């Protein structure tokens, strides 16, 4: 019986997770398999416990997409990207409305997976050597609040809030009231759940909306921040312009922007391949350079107060891509993809959910390489001020 199972399933697993069988022969592979088995076990248990308050977290339901539609929606996402004449992979062939819809689709598909595998802060951070990953994430969030000059009682905008952990951190540390905006309705539901659980209802309020056309009046907020979110805008000027509009005169806006650095060479084929992978695997309409990000803010009227790569600022902090590299080296990425395939086959996940796991997982080695080569940073820190009237 065992021989028959091996004969039937080894080729399937090898097809979707190359190197899996060989990897099992190493001690790291064994550890990774145990981790994936544990994840799969929790997925199954939580899937069966329909009364669980976090069933969507571990059930990997596809967010706002119905289970029966996940396969179709994943295919639509895949076909949304097209290569430009220079080989870059962008959504330029889509209009603004269609581009926003693609980003919404992306977060419907990946939010549960992000929360399950990465926690409630959907961003990277350099890690001081005396801290763990979770502490490093909070320190990274606290810094953006400090750079935006946030004070107690301020009305603050978290632009592209995801499921809200940065906004909750800033609100809890500063005493400000933070309003977060995300394009994805499912993320609002997750944010509300975690905000109530943290006892921060009233200090952090998530709303659903397009950050290139925000439902807020002019001069509403005393400060604003964004963490690895405005990269999802069709054009940076569109989101920066809206932030400028809703800020009061004299207010500060701090952002960790995902951009290519001056080490990126558009004539280097490998560089372009890496950036294409990041664009596709992260739901980004287009990748901008650090210079384009600076110019975008100036074009809408902001005064640039400071700008630097927060990921390269410290010579002693562990790099922002460290955790992803560890996940790859320890086999967590490979075996999680295989676990999703197995759970999909058992109909414990939406049909073809493995496509989503592969969409994100396949880009992770390129993400690490982008950091190691220095051609990309997800945290180019820009601090802007809206001029006084």
From Swiss-Prot:
Task: Please name the GO terms that the record assigns under molecular function.
Answer: S-adenosylmethionine-dependent methyltransferase activity
- Which of the seven top EC classes does this enzyme belong to? transferase
Record Pfam families: Methyltransf_11 (PF08241), Sterol_MT_C (PF08498)
> Where does the record place it?
Microsome membrane
* The EC number(s) this enzyme carries: 2.1.1.-
Purpose: Unable to convert squalene, botryococcene, cycloartenol, zymosterol or lanosterol to mono-, di-, tri- or tetramethylated derivatives.
This protein is called Sterol methyltransferase-like 2
Origin species, per record, is Botryococcus braunii (Green alga)
């Amino acid at each position: 019986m065992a021989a028959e199972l091996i004969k039937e399933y080894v080729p399937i697993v090898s097809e979707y997770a190359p190197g899996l069988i060989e990897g099992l022969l190493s001690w790291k592979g064994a550890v990774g398999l145990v981790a994936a088995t544990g994840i799969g076990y929790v997925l199954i248990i939580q899937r069966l416990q329909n009364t669980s308050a976090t069933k969507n977290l571990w059930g990997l339901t596809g967010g706002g997409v119905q289970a029966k539609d996940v396969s179709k929606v994943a295919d639509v996402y895949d076909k949304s990207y097209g290569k430009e004449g220079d080989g870059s992979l962008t959504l330029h062939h889509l209009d603004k409305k269609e581009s926003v819809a693609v980003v919404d689709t992306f977060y419907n598909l990946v939010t549960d997976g992000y929360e399950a595998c990465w926690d409630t802060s959907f961003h990277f951070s350099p890690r001081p050597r005396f801290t763990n990953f979770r502490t490093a994430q909070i320190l990274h969030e606290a810094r953006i609040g400090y750079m935006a000059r946030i004070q107690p009682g301020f009305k603050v905008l978290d632009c592209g809030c995801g499921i809200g952990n940065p906004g909750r951190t800033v609100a809890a540390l500063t005493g400000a009231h933070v309003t977060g905006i995300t394009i994805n309705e499912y993320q609002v539901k997750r944010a509300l759940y975690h905000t109530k659980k943290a006892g921060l209802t009233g200090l952090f309020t998530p709303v659903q909306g397009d950050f290139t056309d925000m439902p807020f009046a002019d001069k509403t907020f005393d400060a604003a921040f964004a963490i690895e979110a405005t990269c999802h805008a069709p054009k940076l000027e569109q989101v920066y312009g809206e932030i400028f509009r809703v800020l009061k005169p004299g207010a500060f806006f701090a952002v960790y922007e995902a951009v290519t650095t001056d080490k990126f060479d558009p004539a280097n084929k490998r560089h372009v391949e890496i950036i294409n992978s990041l664009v596709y695997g992260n739901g980004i309409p287009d990748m901008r350079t650090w210079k384009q990000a600076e110019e975008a803010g100036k074009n809408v009227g902001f005064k640039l107060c400071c700008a630097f790569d927060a990921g390269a600022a410290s010579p002693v902090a562990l790099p922002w891509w460290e955790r992803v590299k560890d996940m790859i080296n320890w086999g967590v990425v490979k075996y999680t993809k295989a676990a999703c395939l197995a759970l999909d086959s058992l109909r414990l996940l939406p049909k073809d959910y493995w496509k989503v796991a592969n969409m994100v997982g396949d880009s992770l080695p390129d993400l690490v390489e982008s950091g190691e080569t220095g051609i990309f940073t997800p945290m180019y820190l820009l601090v802007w001020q809206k001029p006084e009237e």
